[in-house]
């Protein structure tokens, strides 16, 4: 199972229409930001530079981007993940693993040697680039600022770059390494769709030293995002009250999910407030039994005792999961 959030495989194997499924396979807020009413011209005209500037201004405030650090928008962080290896000077990359697989895949596709390392490992000699997902997906591991600074200083001596994927950092802004970009060779990727529950909008950001952000902006071109994405993103990122309330709501929902999973015999192995990673010696059988009841969670080809569950959207969905688990 390569990624969560796509019911195509589930329906092909187990049938059922999309509405019949409870999709818990992705770490995306199931209660999204309420879409604002958009004027018709947002859909009809090309996005203006003023529209883009307004979005980036909102993002700078939301992500606490300091002066002297730049920011660029793109159609989701996946676009940025694909571009970074092509914009980087020659050199090999270390990926703190296991983690989101598209980072290593993008660098390998660009012809780079990719080395998987553990969070506790020293960076190998000969490495010019390091990729860290923080908080990590799927285990939620957090690397503190001291560790990130140590790695970035090591890489600075090699004229390289540390790329920090903060797709889940909205859950706790104190985790973010954005402030470190002012003095260290770091590019931070921020995902809009996960925390705001609007993954289909395709919006993400790169934050870092001006030289790198200019390189990214030039590669992406003059219209990096659609007009609707600019408008919705600006509204959501400016809504600080919604973000604060959502953090509290997600924490409460995650604890409720913990209770259900623990009662079914799963041991927590990690996660964030948007997903839980759990361990069970019969995890693959559990995955199959749930799928037969049209409940889809995330399994992993590299670990047959792990499953990841996203948050159920409401009490009825949580109860549905609890009933299905109790029958196993």
Regions found by a protein language model. Give the residues of each.
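Conserved PLP-anchoring active-site segment centered on the Schiff-base-forming lysine
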Residues: 85-108, 113-116, 120
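PLP-dependent aminotransferase class I/II
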Residues: 185-269
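Conserved PLP-binding catalytic core of the aspartate aminotransferase-like
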Residues: 251, 261-293, 311
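Active-site phosphate-binding strand-loop segment of PLP-dependent enzymes
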Residues: 115-172
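PLP-dependent enzyme catalytic core of the Aspartate aminotransferase-like
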Residues: 146, 302-328
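Conserved beta-loop-alpha segment that forms the PLP phosphate-binding cup at the N-terminus of a helix
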Residues: 53, 68-93
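Short, conserved charged micro-motifs
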Residues: 35, 122, 282-289, 316-320
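N-terminal "arm"/small-domain region of PLP-dependent enzymes with the aminotransferase-like
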Residues: 1-51, 58
């Amino acid at each position: 199972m390569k990624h969560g959030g796509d019911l195509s495989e589930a329906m092909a194997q187990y049938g059922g229409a999309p509405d019949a499924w409870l999709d818990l396979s992705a770490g995306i807020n199931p209660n999204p930001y309420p879409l604002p009413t958009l004027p018709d011209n947002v859909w009809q005209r090309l996005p203006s530079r003023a529209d883009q500037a307004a979005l980036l201004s909102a993002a700078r405030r939301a992500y606490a981007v300091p002066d002297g650090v730049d920011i660029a928008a793109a159609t989701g962080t996946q676009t940025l993940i694909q571009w970074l290896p092509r914009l980087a000077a020659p050199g090999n990359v270390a990926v703190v693993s296991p983690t989101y697989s598209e980072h290593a895949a993008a660098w390998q596709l660009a012809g780079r040697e990719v080395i998987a390392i553990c969070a506790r490992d020293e960076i190998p000699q000969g490495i010019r680039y390091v990729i860290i997902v923080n908080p990590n997906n799927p285990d939620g591991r957090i690397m503190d600022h001291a560790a990130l600074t140590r790695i970035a200083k090591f890489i600075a001596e090699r004229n390289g770059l540390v790329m920090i994927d903060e797709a889940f950092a909205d859950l706790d802004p104190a985790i973010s390494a954005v402030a470190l970009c002012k003095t260290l060779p770091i590019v931070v990727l921020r995902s809009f769709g996960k925390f705001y529950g609007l993954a289909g909008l395709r919006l993400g950001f790169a934050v870092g030293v001006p030289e790198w952000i200019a390189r990214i902006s030039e590669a992406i071109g003059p219209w990096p995002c659609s007009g609707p994405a600019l408008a919705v993103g600006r509204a959501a990122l400016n809504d600080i009250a919604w973000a604060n309330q959502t953090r509290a709501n997600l924490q409460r929902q995650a604890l409720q999910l913990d209770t259900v999973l623990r009662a079914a015999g799963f041991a927590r192995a990690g996660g964030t407030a948007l997903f839980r990673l759990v361990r069970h010696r019969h995890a693959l059988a559990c995955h199959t039994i749930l799928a037969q009841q049209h409940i889809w969670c995330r399994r992993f080809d590299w670990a047959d005792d792990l499953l990841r569950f996203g948050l159920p959207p409401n009490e009825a969905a949580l109860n549905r999961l609890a009933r299905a688990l109790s029958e196993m």
